[in-house]
Amino acid sequence: MAEPSPAKVYSTGGLYRRWLGAILANDQGLDPEQLTQAALSALSQTSLRRDWPGVSAVLAAIALDLQRHDLRLEQVLFGCRFLNPVGLAAGFDKNGVAASIWDRFGFGFAELGTVTWHGQTGNPRPRLFRLAAEQAALNRMGFNNNGAEVMRRTLEKQALPSPGQRPAVLGLNLGKSRITPLEQAPDDYALSLELLAPLADYAVINVSSPNTPGLRDLQDASQLRRLVERLRRLPGCPPLLVKIAPDLEDDAIDGLARLAYEEGLAGVIAVNTSLDRFGLDGRVLPKTGRTLAEEAGGLSGAPLRQRALEVLRRLRATAGPALPLIGVGGIDSPEAAWERISAGASLVQLYTGWIFKGPDLVPNILDGLIGQLDRHGFRHVSEAVGSGVPWQ
């Protein structure tokens, strides 16, 4: 009898936990930024060589393990065809180095960036901290990226299929360069988008990161309206979404929902990382010896789940069902993904939970969504969006 292939002996998620489980379970394990850089270096080379026979075979095995194909999960939103509603959130593939292979990991879409017009190194290190017990992370990265011109060359080297022809939709998350004065922000965003628009299926206006001084001021309705109007004048402007903070007051959330509707934005992404510490103020970071209350940066992961859900529900109540919403923040299980869809999200995104739980979180969520559709008698995932039906 023939020996089973390695792909059958070890699942992708099993290998991930075997190699990285001990590291991810320890705050003081391998530095999370170094770990991310090592992963992206490997993914970059894989993307560039994806048609080589050996590399292609490995990617095919990963896809067989992690992809799920079910017509009930497919949706067309703001002109983009999503094969499933689970995406990779912005912040991981900042420079788009693995843009061509995210579908192999089961994602229906991936959001690249955040990218700025000027390349920048970001804030001083250490700037990314793992909170293993809480399944969370604290980051103050500061939009470190190679800049829009380098990203364009990086994407072109990967010979991507044209927008609309890709197995995974590619979004572009745009930020303001740190050196650009706030009053010049619209032109700064516009330079990046004008250069990268031909390569993007959609674009996101990121005005909600807590790690660029003054950036959140752009969430003010008048400032954001000015920014949106500047970008929409660009030739070939892709569908525009805005990503908002979880720390907004209810009236500000309502105002942004109304602005998105009035300006014809393609959707809203809720939410970015939070300045709130969600009862973890006294939690000490071993690498600095200081508490979370004393540390700058945005918190992500499981502690953000409830607040992210509240913001999403508020947006849905104000904007109604016509405005597509993307839920992100604390999604680390099929139940959490269903909760967000039931509350009004057409799509969900993963990052911190995906790092902690591993690559099989994506198929686990997709299997869970399919199971819930069956259990509740929904013929399509769109029927579940905003239904308020709980996980069973």
UniProtKB/Swiss-Prot annotation:
One of its GO terms (cellular component) is plasma membrane. It is an enzyme of class 1 (oxidoreductase). Disulfide bonds: none annotated. Substrate binds at K94, N139, R140, M141, G142, F143, N206, N211, N272, T273. One of its GO terms (molecular function) is dihydroorotate dehydrogenase (quinone) activity. Its cofactor is FMN. Binds 1 FMN per subunit. It comes from the Bacteria. The active site is at S209 (nucleophile). Gene3D superfamilies: Aldolase class I (3.20.20.70). It is found in: Cell membrane. FMN binds at A90, G91, F92, D93, K94, T114, N173, N206, K243, V271, G301, G330, Y351, T352. Keywords: Cell membrane, Flavoprotein, FMN, Membrane, Oxidoreductase, Pyrimidine biosynthesis. It is a peripheral membrane protein. One of its GO terms (biological process) is 'de novo' pyrimidine nucleobase biosynthetic process. CDD domains: DHOD_2_like. Its EC number is 1.3.5.2. Pathway: Pyrimidine metabolism; UMP biosynthesis via de novo pathway; orotate from (S)-dihydroorotate (quinone route): step 1/1. It catalyses: (S)-dihydroorotate + a quinone = orotate + a quinol. Monomer. Catalyzes the conversion of dihydroorotate to orotate with quinone as electron acceptor. PANTHER family: DIHYDROOROTATE DEHYDROGENASE (QUINONE), MITOCHONDRIAL, DIHYDROOROTATE DEHYDROGENASE (QUINONE), MITOCHONDRIAL-RELATED. Belongs to the dihydroorotate dehydrogenase family. Type 2 subfamily. HAMAP family: DHO_dh_type2 (MF_00225). This is Dihydroorotate dehydrogenase (quinone).
